[in-house]
Amino acid sequence: MYAATPETPFGSARSQPVITRSVSQRYNHPGQSNHHHLLHSLSFNHQNVLALPAAAREPPVDVKINDIAGNSIAGILYKWVNYGKGWRPRWFVLQDGVLSYYKIKGPDKIVVIHETEKGSRVIGEESTRMISRNKRHAATNNTNHQLRRKPFGEVHLKVSSIRESRSDDKRFSIFTGTKRLHLRAETREDREAWIEALQAVKDMFPRMSNCELMAPTNNLDISIEKLRLRLVEEGVSESAIQDCEQITRSEFSAIQSQLLLLKQKQWLLIDTLRQLETEKVDLENTVVDETQRQAGNGDSEETISESDDDNEQFDEAEEEMDTCDSLSSSSFKSIGSVFRTSSFSSDDDGLTNGFESENDDVDPSIKTIGFNYPHVKRRKKLPDPVEKEKSVSLWSMIKDNIGKDLTKVCLPVYFNEPLSSLQKCFEDLEYSYLLDQASEWGKRGNNLMRILNVAAFAVSGYASTEGRICKPFNPMLGETYEADYPDKGLRFFSEKVSHHPMIVACHCDGTGWKFWGDSNLKSKFWGRSIQLDPIGLLTLQFDDGEIVQWSKVTTSIYNLILGKLYCDHYGTMKIEGNGEYSCKLKFKEQSMIDRNPHQVQGIVEDKNGKTVARLFGKWDESIHYVMVDQGKVNESHLLWKRNKQPENPTKYNLTRFGITLNELTPGLKEKLPPTDSRLRPDQRYLEKGEYEMGNAEKLRLEQRQRQAREMQERGWKPKWFRKEKGSETYRYIGGYWEARDSGSWDDCPDIFGQVHQSIK
């Protein structure tokens, strides 16, 4: 793909943007020629839309990044690999807007000498000494070092951000959007030199403004003036000439607008392609490295190999919550062995209470709490589809929506699952028995076990998202959902309370506790991935008055263009309240080839900040805890384990619990208000596999939904929730279950039309 050149000894000459004359006048570096480099196919100096005579056009001056920032920067930096290897030296080269790195030890090492780095600026005394040592060695052995290996990894600075460590003046990190590179220089001065060089090159890639993207209008004036002179010579009347000028300017303006939109889309796609190129190189190098490792060492689990993404295991010490200090790797070796050898059993229904053989010391009466409710028979599978689903490319649907708000994008029902966002809120309460047990622990005076169970509940809500790649239905304004589950000892209710921004509020009455909250997702569409940042607070109140609050972590969906779609959750979750203990949970971000994804680690602290317990596990499997006694790690115990998946999984990968959420049990339809999600026609058609009818109804409801903003602007208010005074949080005002008992739905809006009456 790239041709090797004398200026690029690593054989990776890359395309570079061409910068206009004004930039070249600011940065004048004569003698630094790079004529062998490939020029970027897109020039910052765009051609005029209207053709001009050659004399009227000034040729652009091609200035490359190395002309501005000098020739390549090179030197040794220490890169964080993993907890087994720690910091390892790598030879880094900054050239053509790309930071590449190479191994300097082992069979894949490169040998750097003065001739191969001629013209490069070398940072660091250690780097200079290494070049000198290699030069003497090369002279003694008469070795040819011109053949260079491919880089072990690459980072494109245009799509990366640089961050300096606040706790260590030698460290910094580079975030590419998909991974983070943790680096450490030899001295503080070396770090400053690297940061300055990296930032200087990154500044060469400014985001193009609209005025830069649009063609210059002064050339248009010249062309129109020439057109006027020609028409005058032909004897055309003044009114006709003015009409021609107006038509020309109007057409030119329209073309400019179209060009602007096309260029913006083009640059977004270029960003995406650069990231894909980097990931391709990373994956190829990792596959080669793993193949060589397995060939030499077999499949031993004790061997720790480096992959380019292993640094994802390392968390910045200056982050808001860093469990690395309190959750040392040595302490987790013993915990991990217990975790791996634990024997998990489950009953025929795939339901467990999270306390098994390794928790025999727990009071048996606690184990049964949350499981002593009356049994209710519910469905175990979705209806068989009536129609065969069409194959539709997700990329073909989203490529025109790069940069847009996802909440405004209308997709066919093929990309939905037969649940609404209101029902998804209730799905987070699948393991509500943990709150029942937390309530009981508090009654018995054990507030530590209470906070541990609350933490396990906060994690358990993410278990159902594993393998779920379809989008839930966006509720209509005023849409509601009820869940009366006596078999779980709770009643749940939710309502869409705002259209823009899209906010869903919920309230749940459990056994000894109440739970409420609202959710507003802030979405970012990166072309190849979607990032969802939850905005809102979840509140849990026990009958004894203790209140606990937390917020959800970030969720991202990856591989929208290439590869298998998957979602990941990452960030820090703080669980705090007016009780004796608080908890901090760290959801670790998954790398592209992570061998142990979905990890969660956390600590429980008392009011004095002393760590009294630790948690670990995976959000899609189980959570364990260990008590901390004067710094000693005790035996681990199981808090929560995910229920078994259905015997016949659905195409949507719904859990056993999720399959029941949209069910119309006998006699339920007559009790529901006309706003309930179970009566939404497009969602019901999708569940039954009637895709054509589902698409038609979805389009009809989307058109109806466009009136929601006008309704909201006219002062529309939700029926069952109100904002708390002095707060943006919505609280349930009551009255729903009373109206349900009396069947008083006359004042409820018919948001779906009359179609729901025919749904069976």
Curated annotation (Swiss-Prot):
Residues 70-203 form the PH domain. InterPro entries: OSBP_sf (IPR037239), Oxysterol-bd (IPR000648), PH-like_dom_sf (IPR011993), PH_domain (IPR001849). It comes from the Eukaryota. Residues 495-501 are annotated as: Conserved. Residues 299-323 have a biased composition (Acidic residues). GO terms for cellular component: cytosol; membrane. The keyword Transmembrane does not apply. Expressed in roots and at lower levels in stems. CDD domains: PH_ORP_plant. PANTHER family: OXYSTEROL-BINDING PROTEIN-RELATED, OXYSTEROL-BINDING PROTEIN-RELATED PROTEIN 1A-RELATED. Belongs to the OSBP family. This is Oxysterol-binding protein-related protein 1A. It comes from Arabidopsis thaliana.
